[in-house]
Curated annotation (Swiss-Prot):
<keyword id="KW-1015">Disulfide bond</keyword>
<keyword id="KW-0964">Secreted</keyword>
<feature type="compositionally biased region" description="Polar residues">
    <location>
        <begin position="163"/>
        <end position="175"/>
    </location>
</feature>
<feature type="disulfide bond">
    <location>
        <begin position="101"/>
        <end position="111"/>
    </location>
</feature>
<dbReference type="GO" id="GO:0005896">
    <property type="term" value="C:interleukin-6 receptor complex"/>
</dbReference>
<keyword id="KW-0202">Cytokine</keyword>
<comment type="similarity">
    <text>Belongs to the IL-6 superfamily.</text>
</comment>
<comment type="subunit">
    <text>Component of a hexamer of two molecules each of IL6, IL6R and IL6ST; first binds to IL6R to associate with the signaling subunit IL6ST. Interacts with IL6R (via the N-terminal ectodomain); this interaction may be affected by IL6R-binding with SORL1, hence decreasing IL6 cis signaling. Interacts with SORL1 (via the N-terminal ectodomain); this interaction leads to IL6 internalization and lysosomal degradation. May form a trimeric complex with the soluble SORL1 ectodomain and soluble IL6R receptor; this interaction might stabilize circulating IL6, hence promoting IL6 trans signaling.</text>
</comment>
<keyword id="KW-0732">Signal</keyword>
<dbReference type="GO" id="GO:0005615">
    <property type="term" value="C:extracellular space"/>
</dbReference>
<dbReference type="GO" id="GO:0008284">
    <property type="term" value="P:positive regulation of cell population proliferation"/>
</dbReference>
<dbReference type="GO" id="GO:0070102">
    <property type="term" value="P:interleukin-6-mediated signaling pathway"/>
</dbReference>
<dbReference type="GO" id="GO:0072540">
    <property type="term" value="P:T-helper 17 cell lineage commitment"/>
</dbReference>
<dbReference type="GO" id="GO:0005138">
    <property type="term" value="F:interleukin-6 receptor binding"/>
</dbReference>
<dbReference type="InterPro" id="IPR009079">
    <property type="entry name" value="4_helix_cytokine-like_core"/>
</dbReference>
<dbReference type="InterPro" id="IPR030473">
    <property type="entry name" value="IL6/GCSF/MGF_CS"/>
</dbReference>
<keyword id="KW-0597">Phosphoprotein</keyword>
Length: 212
């Protein structure tokens, strides 16, 4: 079967497909062929096949790129905002040497754990985007749902799929309070910072996945 380009999916169709995938706990291709026909089967197989992790990450990166472009065009929040972003003290997940994802000191199990945990930590920031992002809401929804699907996929690759930590609800509540902005300018600055940070995290993750 020919592979399908993720750019061809609409956010709504893609999101529905991922929800079905997650609800059925990653069924086998044979099961999928029994459940649906034609393109619907192909769409679901794209995200249940173990070798499609890269495509899923690329899909998310494409949506992030589209959102950043929207922010740039609508609010002029472009690359010239780096100085402002550097001063922002949000505690966004980042890759470090100890995480085992860099070529020097690479450790597959440690790296998988860090990627999974980091993506879980990003969920609260994506909740914020769902609430505050005012442009194409479909892109935000697609990023959040596909990120959750990526978490499930990566957990299956690790030796301890349930070991990834879940942020404390109290911590999340405090973080949401911290994210609340007093003005439109700061809100948009936080949105672009979250998008940039998630993009960087996924770029590091993609490079690590390629050498696993």
């Amino acid at each position: 079967m020919n592979s399908l380009s993720t750019s061809a999916f609409s956010p709504v169709a893609f999101s529905l497909g991922l929800l079905l995938v997650m609800a059925t706990a990653f069924p086998t291709p044979e099961r999928l062929e029994e459940d649906a026909k034609g393109d619907a089967t192909s769409d679901k197989m794209l995200f249940t096949s173990p070798d499609k992790t890269e495509e899923l990450i690329k899909y998310i990166l494409g949506k992030i790129s589209a959102m950043r472009k929207e922010m740039c065009e609508k609010y002029e929040k472009c690359e010239n905002s780096k100085e402002v972003l550097a001063e922002n003290n949000l505690n966004l997940p980042k890759m470090a040497e100890k995480d085992g994802c860099f070529q020097s000191g690479f450790n597959q199990e440690t790296c998988l754990m860090r990627i999974t945990t980091g993506l879980v930590e990003f969920q609260i920031y994506l909740d914020y985007l769902q609430k505050e992002y005012e442009s194409n809401k479909g892109n935000v929804e697609a990023v959040q749902i596909s990120t959750k699907a990526l978490i499930q996929t990566l957990r299956q690759k690790g030796k301890n799929p349930d070991k990834a930590t879940t942020p404390n609800p109290t911590t999340n509540a405090g973080l949401l309070d911290k994210l609340q902005s007093q003005n439109e300018w700061m809100k948009n600055t936080k949105i672009i910072l979250i998008l940039r940070s998630l993009e960087d995290f996924l770029q590091f993750s993609l490079r690590a996945i390629r050498i696993m």
